């Protein structure tokens, strides 16, 4: 199994959450791959810049050296995101655009999204785990 960490999970890892760090360690010991979306990178980076947090930014940059960032450089991801967005809107259960892009990336890359955000459960075909509940 390979994973795509959502923004809330990366944030908890940066805050040294023991459950998240333990699960990351277990996954690494099983040689499972862990990725970060460029959307997550953007969300966390903008947050640290907005509050002028150089130490946290440095910790985040180190974290990003450990786990590859997946970029939105594939039109198929954007097409899948558009389909997910339309489907959720038609069902009357929209979610944030950032979450749609993360979900589309995970579906096309065959990754499990790790998140503490229950909104992602609305996305059909998305594999989702909440490492805070395991």
Listing of model-derived features with the role each one plays in the protein:
Residues 1-36, 48-62, 134:
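Short, well-structured N-terminal submotif of metal-dependent ribonuclease cores
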Residues 10-11, 21, 42-45, 121, ...:
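Nucleotide phosphate-binding site architecture
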Residues 6-7, 44, 81, 106, ...:
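Generic structural signal for small/hydrophobic residues in well-ordered secondary structure
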């Amino acid at each position: 199994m390979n994973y795509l960490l959502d923004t809330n999970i990366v944030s908890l890892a940066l805050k040294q959450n023991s459950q998240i760090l333990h699960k990351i360690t277990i996954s690494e010991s099983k040689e499972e791959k862990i990725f970060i979306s460029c959307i997550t990178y953007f969300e966390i980076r903008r947050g640290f810049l907005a509050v002028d947090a150089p130490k946290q930014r440095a910790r985040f940059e180190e974290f990003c050296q450990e786990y590859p960032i997946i970029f939105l450089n594939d039109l198929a991801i954007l097409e899948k995101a558009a389909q997910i967005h339309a489907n959720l809107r038609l069902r009357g259960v929209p979610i944030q655009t950032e979450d749609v892009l993360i979900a589309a990336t995970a579906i096309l890359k065959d990754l499990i999204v790790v998140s503490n955000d229950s909104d992602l459960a609305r996305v059909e075909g998305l594999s989702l785990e909440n490492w805070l509940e395991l």
